[in-house]
A protein has these predicted regions:
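Feature 926 captures the class I aminoacyl-tRNA synthetase adenylation module centered on the KMSKS loop
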Residues: 201, 417-477, 481, 526-569, ...
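Secondary-structure transition/capping motifs at alpha-helix termini
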Residues: 67-75, 96-109, 129, 133-138, ...
Length: 901
């Protein structure tokens, strides 16, 4: 048998254990026709990222599920991998180049990509090694990257299929533009922040009547791109202006007044300015009225100038403009200013010209980039889009039919809201790091060719000069294919794809249901004909101890690796799930980490005690039932119940409840009670009693370690290996299940009567400050004496009884006796010689006053007809029970006071 160190030191165990798992190949999974598959694909963290608490909770939950299923006999596959993270990675590389005095353009696309791949190689393994420190039992032989050869093949296959089906198109549409990242982003990537702003009330003169039309805007810098003013055709205030024009202030340009339902008669003056190039609603108005689209912002957030206009004019002159191609304005004196600089200058000029009537402060939601938090500029830009309506419909139906369920169920609504309100997905990004769009343009005739590999000639004109689209695909485009691209798709003959797909459970945060979950669902259905998983298990975010979101600005982030270095990975893992509820945010608590570490130490010490009491020739195995005493059957029944309950909890993704159950069983049942109960038997001199106690101790410990293993894998492996008869690894051992043969309900109930009585006696002695060495006789009044008679050795050891008398009804003198009561027994214990009478009377009188106060409070509630009639029946019953218990408590206190004279 292996000898354990006196103290548990995770730093001496965890790395060694993990390497042994890797060397043993225990994480690797292959198709096995004799086993049922269970598959999880890891939400791929950014390749340049570092482990944070979100990763820690996400991967701990996945590891718990995988380890459990592996022990339950499944071919449990957990596919790991990382995401290329276009925007984030490109920003990191650009920042590093800037420090060298370089830009992307200076080194060119190929040179930049060489640097990006070098960056990925240098930093890409960092988060993988950190996930290993956490204990993640992924199949690292199958590690994937969203830009590896297989994923790239899948991306090109999907793009070409969708294009051929008419579901991918390129056009000038309104997009969300980030001037800092210098790329478009999708609707789902826009975060909204409440900010202070203003409504600037402007005056536009009507050419035909000379009157002033008042309108309000939060973005006066866009007015240079106004191509109309809208009124509602039903608004009687402006009926006389139908067909008229306004003169655009500052530019002195005539633009039409159009009648459109977008102008709300009930809001403000009912007049709105229309800037089709820089507002999504205005863009739609522009399409309805065939208005010019005039862009006044550059893509890096400045006002357009002469050079910008010349480039656009040349495009139009060459006939290369496409539908909804924006014209570009030379903004003159404002050209080159940032949008905020232009706002100040334009407002000053409007005020000077008498066109600024009023400034109205307001709070409003401003769209920001989810990556850099810069303000998003709506822009009409030529981009690639996916038509969402045909793809969203089956994805909605799949969830409605129950093919995919969300846990907790309430997140189904989040998913449905997103899917039912989704717009066409802008998938092109003006970045170099990522999957370059597989589309080429003929330099001779302008034909667009979409193909999985570079075409040699133009199919339209035969030209040989073709240029690939410089844009890359949205990162989420490749991530959407993750559940099946990692298993061999588009090779539908892939053995892994046939066996492990569809996957089973997706574990992820609620913040990316729109970004990622929804896209995986419609992608799986569209390209494989199957839902990619059957369950989406949602977890919340980890907040700090004050309930605040962890952020760099607050400086309240917690580094999981620092926690692991201090307390061990097991303690961090257990803290993250113990008592947690699916879908709810959780608070990081160092106190809870310390408690988890203490739990590990408690288990370590308990195992050392058991091992020290085993003879060298000990062979594990439960003795026959006739050799088991009441306490053995009690602990085996408790173990049985915990195994059944935990299995049910984990089947329903209630990891917090499962963790709490095994914690309570090991700490309260096994360590605090059963080990203590076993000690007298181990030292009794009765060989059979000692052997039975040892066998039950080892059997229960073995099962408890297996139940705890998914939560605390390192310490359970180390302790399991120390047990006699252990196998190569705990992680491939059978998961304990409910066993009807080990369910002794009568013995459990009987022994708990004894336990309750012992607890009551010990509590009383503690309150009276009676030293354990001071023992006394006792009389036990009970209608069922058998459990107590069978447990006299425990009464002597733990209730400090010298001798015990049993009676159904005690009618003797109670002078000098203290009474303790439980639901099954009442004890009469002579304590006068063991206590300080005056101190005890003072304590009892204090307890009496407290009990009288409780009794009065519950009585007042029950005497209130309105409470009894209107409160929930369960609450009223609960108050009645508390009232009855308070009555019994007060009666016992009064009897004890009387006994003390």
């Amino acid at each position: 048998m292996k000898e354990l160190a006196k103290q548990y030191d995770p730093s001496q165990v965890e790395d060694r254990i993990y390497q042994a798992w890797l060397d043993g190949g225990y994480f690797h999974t292959k198709a096995d026709p004799d086993k049922k598959p269970y598959t999880i694909v890891m939400p791929p963290p950014n390749v340049t990222g570092q482990l944070h608490m979100g990763h820690a909770v996400d991967n701990t939950m996945q590891d718990i599920l995988i380890r459990t299923k592996r022990m339950q006999g499944y071919a449990a596959l957990w596919v790991p991998g990382t995401d290329h993270a276009s925007i984030a990675t490109e920003a990191k590389v650009v920042e590093a180049m800037r420090a060298e005095g370089l830009t992307k353009e200076m080194v060119g696309r190929d040179g930049f990509l060489d640097r990006a791949w070098a960056w990925k190689t240098k930093f890409g393994n960092r988060i993988v090694s950190q996930l290993k420190k956490l204990g993640s039992s992924c199949d690292w032989d199958r590690e994937r990257f969203t830009m590896d050869e297989g994923c790239s093949e899948a991306v090109k296959e999907v793009f070409v299929r969708l294009y051929d089906q008419g579901l991918i198109y390129r056009g000038n549409r309104m997009v969300n533009w980030c001037p800092h990242c210098n790329t478009s982003i999708s609707d789902a990537e826009v975060e909204y922040e409440e900010k202070d702003g203003n409504f600037w009330h402007l005056l536009y003169p009507v050419k035909e009547t000379g009157e002033m039309l008042e309108l309000a805007t939060t973005r006066p810098e866009t007015m240079l791109g106004d191509t109309a003013v809208a009124i509602n055709g039903e608004d009687p205030r402006y009926a006389h202006l139908h067909g008229c024009h306004v003169v655009l202030p500052l530019l002195n340009k005539e633009i039409p007044i159009v009648c459109d339902e977008h102008a709300d008669m009930t809001k403000g003056t009912g007049v709105v300015k229309i800037t089709p190039a820089h507002d999504p609603n205005d863009f739609e108005v522009g399409l309805r009225h065939d208005l010019p689209i005039v862009r006044v912002f550059t893509y890096d957030g400045h006002m357009t100038g002469a050079a910008d206009k010349a480039a656009a004019d040349a495009l139009f002159a060459a006939g290369k403009n496409t539908v909804n191609e924006p014209q570009v304005l030379d903004c003159g004196k404002y050209a080159g200013m940032t949008t905020l600089e232009a706002r100040k200058a334009i407002l000053a000029d409007l005020k000077e010209g008498g066109f600024l009537k009023e400034i109205e402060p307001l709070k409003h939601e401003v769209g920001t980039c989810y990556r850099c938090h810069s303000t998003i500029e709506p822009m009409v830009s030529k981009q690639w889009f996916v038509k969402m309506e045909p793809l969203a419909k089956p994805a909605i139906e799949s969830v409605e039919k129950g093919e995919i369920k969300f846990v907790p169920e309430r997140f189904t609504k989040n998913y449905m809201n997103w899917m039912k309100n989704t717009r066409d997905w802008c998938i092109s990004r003006q970045l170099w790091w990522g999957h370059q769009i597989p589309a080429w343009y003929c330099d001779d005739c302008g034909e667009t060719v979409v193909a999985k590999s570079a075409p040699c000639t133009c199919p339209k004109c035969g030209g040989t000069k073709l240029t690939q689209d410089p844009d890359t695909l949205d990162t989420w485009f490749s991530s959407a294919l993750w559940p099946f691209s990692t298993l061999g798709w588009p090779n539908e003959d892939s053995a892994d794809l046939k066996y492990f797909y569809p996957t089973n459970t997706l574990v992820t945060g609620y913040d990316i249901i729109g970004f990622w979950v929804s896209r995986m669902i419609f992608s799986g259905l569209a390209y494989t004909g199957k839902a990619p998983f059957d369950t989406v298990c949602i977890h919340g975010i980890v907040r700090d101890s004050q309930g605040r979101k962890m952020s760099k600005s607050l400086g309240n982030g917690i580094d999981p690796l620092e926690v692991i270095a201090k307390y061990g990975a097991d303690a961090l893992r257990f803290m993250l799930v113990d008592g947690s509820t699916p879908g709810n945010d959780m608070r990081y608590s160092e106190t809870k980490v310390e408690a988890a570490r203490n739990f590990a130490n408690k288990l370590w010490n308990a195992t050392r005690f058991v091992l020290m009491n085993l003879p060298e020739d000990f062979e594990p195995g439960l003795p026959s039932e006739d050799k088991l005493d009441m306490s053995d059957k009690w602990v085996l029944t408790k173990l049985n119940q915990v195994a059944g309950a935990m299995t049910d909890n984990l089947d329903h993704y209630e990891m917090g409840l499962a963790a709490a159950k095994i914690n309570s069983f090991i700490w309260d049942v096994y360590c605090d009670w059963f080990i203590e109960i076993a000690k007298p038997r181990l030292n009794s001199g009765d060989a059979q009693q000692a052997d039975t106690a040892r066998r039950v101790l080892v059997y229960v410990l073995d099962k408890a370690l297996k139940l705890l293993h998914p939560f605390m894998p390192f310490i359970t492996e180390e302790l399991y290996q120390a047990l006699p008869g252990s196998a190569e690894t705990i992680m491939t051992q059978a998961w304990p299940t409910f066993d009807a043969a080990h369910n002794w309900a009568a013995e459990e109930e009987a022994f708990e009567k004894v336990m309750d009585y012992i607890k009551a006696v010990r509590t009383m002695r503690t309150e009276m400050n009676v030293h354990p060495a001071k023992k006394t006789s006792m009389i036990i009044e009970t209608a069922d004496a058998a459990p107590f008679q069978n447990a006299q050795v425990y009464l002597a050891k733990f209730a400090f009884a010298t001798d015990v008398t049993f009676t159904e009804k005690y009618e003797g003198s109670t002078d000098g006796m203290v009474q303790v009561s439980t639901h099954a027994a009442r004890g009469f214990i002579p304590m006068m010689e063991l206590i300080d009478r005056e101190k005890e009377l003072a304590r009892l009188n204090k307890e009496k006053a407290k009990a009288e106060k409780e009794l009065a409070m519950f009585g007042n509630q029950l005497n209130n007809p309105k409470f009894v009639e209107r409160a929930p029946a369960a609450l009223v019953e609960d108050i009645r029970n508390k009232f009855a218990k308070s009555q019994d408590k007060l009666a016992n206190i009064e009897q004890s006071i009387q006994a003390l004279g």
